[in-house]
Amino acid sequence: PFYSANSRSQFSPVPLENENPLIQKNTAYDQLDLFQKFLVQINEKRQLSLNLQYSNSSDIPRYDKLVETRNGNLRYAEWYYGPQKRLFLSPQYKVFTDKKFLNSGRLTFGYQHVEESRNSRDFGSLTRQYQREKVKVFSLNGDFEFDLDEKHSFSYGFEGTYNKVRSLAYQYDLIINQNKVEGSAPRLPIPTRYPSAKSSYGSFAIFINWVWDLNEN
């Protein structure tokens, strides 16, 4: 079996032989994940929390693409996801009451920002293709419940979401000097994966759930 020794900065015109087929050459990557929760007990019946998440990675080579063949030869010199970045922020407010139609409830807001890219180049070509997507997701959830009596309980709520996607794509030729990538030619636009002028999607839903305890069994 053969593998590609190419990278962002290294140019290798031909595949190299993999002496140990049990090792997936040039497919390692690094990833950082941070997670933190905060909780504020306002009083006995009110609670506020905050969920924070962040992750980032190095380039992530896609192994199934790097071993794909065409006419008996490796097809791709490069195929990797660019650094995948994700930020998540979600505050939540909880309340506990003795009202007739509300024993407990919570409101949850969510914001998420995701960014990733796809990069590829064929063997025998100096042209690298770049596709990038940025996604923003907003959401608001409401969940409430109460007991009508000992046998009847209800839960109800809603969810609203809004998603916004922005896509960018271009290609450029690499400038090579002794197997080193020293720069690139001017970028040329290519078709994007999603509408380049931004696209969005929204949804809204409500629900109600009734539990009737017929007997102890």
Question: What does each of the following model-derived ranges do?
Answer:
Residues 2-12, 16, 64-74, 121-130, ...:
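Flexible, surface-exposed loop regions and adjacent strand-edge segments
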Residues 41-55, 83-217:
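Face-selective signature of the C-terminal outer-membrane beta-barrel domain
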Residues 1-59, 85-87:
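Transmembrane beta-barrel wall of Gram-negative outer-membrane proteins
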Residues 52-78:
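C-terminal/domain-terminus segments
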Residues 23-25, 63-65, 78, 118-120:
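Outer-membrane beta-barrel domain signature, especially the mid-to-C-terminal portions
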Residues 21-23, 77, 128, 193-194:
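Short, contiguous strand/loop micro-motifs
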